[in-house]
Amino acid sequence: MTDVSATTGRAGDRVSSTSSEVAVETTSQALTNGAAKEPLAAVTAEATATATVTATTTATVTATTTAATATMATAVISKQAKSECHSQSNNNQHVETAPSKQSSDSEASAPTTVSIPSANAKINSSSSGKTTATQQDVDEVARLFEEKPEAFEKWLTERAPPEALSRLHEFIESRKPHKRPSVTSDLFQQWMASPTVQQKSPRKLSNSSVHALPESRRHLMELDEGELFMELIRDVANELDIDVLCHKILVNVGLLTHADRGSLFLAKGTPNNRYLVAKLFDVTQTTALKDAVTRARAEEIIIPFGIGIAGMVAQTKQMINIKEAYKDARFNCEIDLKTGYTTNAILCMPICNYEGDIIGVAQIINKTNGCMEFDEHDVEIFRRYLTFCGIGIQNAQLFEMSVQEYRRNQILLNLARSIFEEQNNLECLVTKIMTEARELLKCERCSVFLVDLDCCEESHLEKIIEKPHQLQQQRTPRAIMSGDSFEEKQNMRNRFTVLFELGGENHAANVSRPSINDLSHSTLAQIAQFVATTGQTVNICDVQDWVREHNQIRAESEIDSTQAILCMPIVNAQKTVIGVAQLINKASGLPFTESDASIFEAFAIFCGLGIHNTQMYENACKLMAKQKVALECLSYHATASQDQTEKLAQDVIAEAEAYNLYSFTFTDFDLVDDDTCRAVLRMFMQCNLVSQFHIPYDVLCRWVLSVRKNYRPVKYHNWRHALNVAQTMFAMLKTGKMERFMTDLEILGLLVACLCHDLDHRGTNNAFQTKTESPLAILYTTSTMEHHHFDQCVMILNSEGNNIFQALSPEDYRSVMKTVESAILSTDLAMYFKKRNAFLELVENGEFDWQGEEKKDLLCGMMMTACDVSAIAKPWEVQHRVAKLVADEFFDQGDLEKLQLNTQPVAMMDRERKDELPKMQVGFIDVICLPLYRVLCDTFPWITPLYEGTLENRRNWQDLAEKVEMGLTWIDHDTIDKPVEEFAGCADEEIKDIEFTVTTLNCNQHGGSAGGGEDTHTPEHQRSSSRLSIKKTGALGKVVRSKLSKTLYNSMDGSKPKTSLKLLESHVSEDMDDKSPTSPSQPHSGSVGRMSASSSTSSAGTVDKSKKRSKLCALL
């Protein structure tokens, strides 16, 4: 052969078309001569005398043409090569390609050597010399190719010899990179590179084989062996049906090897228990697919690895070629005896995947062309064809697995859908799950054991109704735990309370409650008991061996019926075993596989989900039924009696003025309970709501009495508080002229909301409900108590004879209920803070039209809050008493927090800090009340009394707060008669550790004080008042205590500080004259001095009383 080196260069001057053609012909002649002189055997053996064609990677011949030219050239080459192959069908052609492994940079300079054998045997035999092209020739050809690609294209199509085209085509194909690594491509290249078995003449189909072919495949007889081989590979290449593929493999192998019949076995089982299953058995050239599949499924043949000829091939991965079968000890003649067929020669070969693992075994029997054995050529053809068949079988198995997985997913989706469709019927749900499992896994029977569902349900109900933070003995589900003792396990026979059984396809599901005796004498129950105890999956291949191994009693009736069992626990969300699922006997008689266990696990999970969901649904239904019963009982007991209703309906209702309903200073202290109800009726009458909305008078009376009845007797948030809130709303509507901004329906809703806004109040706030995780906090996550109040309001309205909205139209009913709900929820101060800024923005913008839905909602919310805290604007005597009630209720909650939650309550709920209440009241007024009333009275000036009353009470609370800061404790009485707590003690009690702290705020002198030389420049606004703080660590005498209290309050009422100090001096002096303190006082420097006197038994001497008095006066 001739080396042809082509290098790339930039295009130079164009040359004539004739010169290009001459150069092309020269190159072609060189290629032809080289091919003619190279024998085929030397090419296959890679002889050293092979000619090479050297070219750089970036300067191949194809690079000199355009894309269109390359495409046309390839087509022409393929056509010419095909024609040449037909004309030279008796010769073999092998292509050896040695691609460069260097980097792209080195490839630009390093030559690539390609050995191109010729396909023309005549040329090979006539070669006699060798011609080498010079570098100058190569450069000239390269330049002409770059300048005249059209001339090269014309030469290729018109004048190129077939052998040159063939060699050029092979060279181009060898230079193409693979798109991706391909197992099929690697195997194909390996097969193509392997040496062929020399045959003296081409192998043709025998006459018997030709006549056995169906009409659609008669054309195969016209093909030689190579073409037939490739055609039969294409026949199985795209087949994904495993049955059709195996049938084609056996038929095609029979054609290639002239075998009479064949069988194909597929490998199954676990790594520790591998066996072969006959996919198709004894398939001939004329056997139809349907008949072959039916026969194989009717009698499944299973061969363990290492048993028989096929088993040995599967185990050793080595082919076995037997010339005389009956002389081989591994041959089993039972099939021949049954069928009357005589087996002579057997060729059995393994089928492996790309990893070398056995996926099947193919076996062919007897030759049909007169030969008595399978020769070496048959073995090679068989091996090569099975290489491709292995790829096809694995692809078909993967496809079959994907189809099965799709079916399984569809079944699981149906099961998931069934969980929600059958959630009200556990029996139907479990039956459907068992039916799907039986059909998918092909087993004879299914059963499901359930564990003590009643106890599980009771435990769940107890958890739902469990009181927060209360120690309660928990009942756990009677599930079987692995840590139970042997005696406990023996006593757990009665744990299975329900048994679901499903037999064959025509059998209905059976649901039973087995007794202890039934469970004790049932092998299936014992296995289920074992699984429930251990919580492990059990796959039993031989039940009898398992019973013997575990010393269990086997029921005689189950000895012959049960062979293999797959048993799996059913667990709930807490990983507790709530049941056991069983699959009994595969239809094929084989044990359950790991794949079966994996699928069955999904069924067990869905079964557990379904059981749990059904139980929850049933529990929810029962709880709702109980709730309905409880609501009926509550409705009956919460509704006012008929006698009370008739009595109230017959009472004479006084005018509004008699109850002082129009005034913002209304108080309920003087009203009896019946009067409170009459006052409510009068408010409805004065607003003309009874006649406007056609409210039956007896229904209104019953509703008012029922609302009063549903308030708990707490200290503040009780019925009388609701009455005061409703009266304030009435006064704002009438006296405050707010009714001009409201419709009659909204007035009705606001009054109802005021009366119901604290229904069933427990004396605790929302924060307490959340901290204790009460059922109310679980039911309502925000505005907990307010939502409960509204629900109670709805409950009373829905009670028989209490619906005061019964005459409203559906639209009006929805509107008034929306008003009631929004108004009640607005009493939550958290809602007030959310709405306040929006309301203030509207007021600051000068809003006067409040008829929009959002603006009306804001206005009603502000009015509800103003009414709810309106006690802060009552006269001081009323406000003081109400504040005492609020404080007592808060202190009760604080005590509960200490007791139940073991936490320190906030200051306003801490009984130990009750003296700080005046200060906290001032803060409450400044933060909530005054801003609200100020903006309301600025916009609606008719409600100014609320703002003024709040200001007055703030001054009173501030005054009392200052007294507390002076060291005096707040009152512990219901009235203001004795505003300062009396110091307890007796008149004759000795003086003990009295500590005085005096702060002088009214100083006219600018020099030093008696206690020190400190300069006191007092601000102007502090010179008109004095502050006196007395801290008591011991006890004073009774006389000085009473005089001191009166003096302090007289001084705070307006007497001059100097007079007060003189009185204080005289009282202290009188008391000191009566006592004889023995320890001198030690005044501190500055404007604050301290003096202590204590009684002592020491006789160290007496103290000058006049000196002591002068020091105290100087300090004051």
UniProtKB/Swiss-Prot annotation:
Annotated catalytic residues: H717
Domain PDEase: start-end pairs: 641-964
Low complexity bias: start-end ranges: 15-28, 1085-1103
Region annotation (Disordered) ranges: 1-36, 82-136, 1005-1031, 1067-1116
UniProt keyword annotation of Protease present: no
MF (Gene Ontology): 3',5'-cyclic-GMP phosphodiesterase activity; metal ion binding
Gene Ontology terms describing biological process: cGMP metabolic process; signal transduction
Basic and acidic residues: compositionally biased ranges: 1014-1023, 1067-1076
Gene Ontology annotations for the cellular component aspect, listed alphabetically: membrane; plasma membrane
PTM sites of type Cysteine methyl ester: C1113
UniProt: a divalent metal cation 1 binding residues: H721, H757, D758, D868
Binding sites annotated in the UniProt record for a divalent metal cation 2: D758
Keyword Nuclease: no
SUPFAM superfamilies in the cross-refs: GAF domain-like, HD-domain/PDEase-like
Family annotation (Gene3D superfamilies): 3'5'-cyclic nucleotide phosphodiesterase, catalytic domain, 3.30.450.40
Biased composition annotated in UniProt, kind: Polar residues: 86-136
Domain GAF: start-end pairs: 241-393, 425-611
Cell compartment(s), UniProt: Cell membrane
Reactions accelerated catalytically: 3',5'-cyclic GMP + H2O = GMP + H(+)
Classification via PANTHER family: CYCLIC NUCLEOTIDE PHOSPHODIESTERASE
Family that this chain belongs to: Belongs to the cyclic nucleotide phosphodiesterase family.
Protein name per its UniProtKB record: cGMP-specific 3',5'-cyclic phosphodiesterase
Gene: Pde6
